[in-house]
Amino acid sequence: MALVFNNVTVPQSGNVIYNGTSLSAVKMGATEVWKRQKTVYPGAPVANTQNLGYGPYFTVTNNGSDIKVDAFGGTERGWGRVILGPFSSAGYSKLYFSALRAYITNAFSKVSVSLGDINGNWVQRLIYHDTGESLGGYDVTFGSGDLFTINSANSNYYLILEVDSGATARGLNATIQMNGCYLI
């Protein structure tokens, strides 16, 4: 939620400075009325990349502000995950993406975005889609209006982006592309 003070709107991505100190939260009495968002990505490093399928069919492209995880399903299965972090969600209850696009054009394919550990074990799945036998047809972009509640007591997480494209010999993909992840 934005803070409006003297007709000036301060977004959660902005700064509130009081007596020369940058505040992370503003309270009115005992009620918190503004909290600065915490950036997970860009910022969180790639802690682990796991290629779980046919090596050449899994790619990760990361320029520091945009990350793309892609699995190609050809004669073999493309499957892998990138793990970003660690980061602490202590004091935050929700997560959102400024732009995360998940799309699948292949059958027997999946995309998954989860909170978990460095080994790729997920604690909470945020986004998951499995095409089963149908030929793709999944293309969704999640933005700042799509809030995900963090529902685990654990506060130390990694963000896991996982793609799996079936061995269908069709040469089609399962892809996740993200350019911002924030805690509020």
Model-identified regions with their sequence ranges:
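Short beta-strands within extracellular/lumenal beta-sheet-rich domains
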Residues: D66-K94, V140-D146, T175-N179
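Short beta-strand-plus-loop segments that form exposed binding edges in beta-rich domains
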Residues: L161-R170
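Extracellular carbohydrate recognition and processing domains
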Residues: G120-N154
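Intrinsically disordered, compositionally biased repeat/linker segments
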Residues: M1-R36
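A short beta-strand element within beta-rich, extracytoplasmic domains
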Residues: A90-T105
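Beta-strand acidic-aromatic groove motif in beta-rich domains, primarily in extracellular
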Residues: T105-L115, G171-A174
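Extracellular carbohydrate-recognition regions
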Residues: T31-F58
